[in-house]
């Protein structure tokens, strides 16, 4: 028997608490497939599910890539070949999940998003997953997904700047991730710093207007923006 929407949400929470994120994804995909607007809670559950299944594999990929470089430095060709095969396996899993979430966003989530907040949330998500794609791809494929990430972040930013307060956690989270995109994917530290500084300055100016319900979330992201700015400006100073 197919689970009801309420059951899927409850099962998704159980899967989250037991750290069974692959199952959490499946339950939230069932909710998304109903093609109605997700509640804030449902939206967050879906986001957490994909973030964890992809996050663990991104971490694995970084470790394996680092080990591959170490073996290359030692000139151990046999180990390098084995590691390359293993890295390819992780990349296949990453591609599968990125394709999966991007399809859900395009087919189920964005067509049913009626508020600016939900549109920004999903376009930001789209930018994020194309960015993750760009981390492990090369050449033409990397260029293609980087362009799509840039387009999604840009559209999200336009809606966000028009309709969300500078202190809104989703607007701040978007600025944080978009600036990371410029720094890590485009290798444009100046643009990354400019974007992060603008978001930080705009939110500081309106800090007294932050509703109590989102104060903690907003200030946490503001701190992350400031941390990145500190790191990036010291990095560029070191290079000079």
Swiss-Prot record:
Any one GO cellular component localisation term in the record: cell projection
GO biological process, one term: signal transduction
Pfam families per the UniProt record, alphabetical: 14-3-3 (PF00244)
Effect of a null allele: RNAi-mediated knockdown reduces the rate of phagocytosis and motility. Coactosin recruitment to the phagocytic cups is impaired.
Domain of life: Eukaryota
Record keywords, A-Z: Cell projection, Cytoplasm, Phagocytosis
SUPFAM superfamilies registered for this protein in UniProt: 14-3-3 protein
Location of this chain's protein in the cell: Cytoplasm; Cell projection, Phagocytic cup
Record-annotated disulphide pairs: none
Function: Adapter protein which is required for phagocytosis and motility, probably by regulating actin cytoskeleton dynamics. During phagocytosis, plays a role in the initiation and/or formation of the phagocytic cup and is involved in the recruitment of the actin binding protein coactosin to the phagocytic cup.
Subunit structure: Interacts with coactosin. Interacts with ACTO/actophorin.
Family to which the UniProt record says this protein belongs: Belongs to the 14-3-3 family.
Name listed for the protein in its UniProt record: 14-3-3 protein 3
The species this protein was found in: Entamoeba histolytica (strain ATCC 30459 / HM-1:IMSS / ABRM)
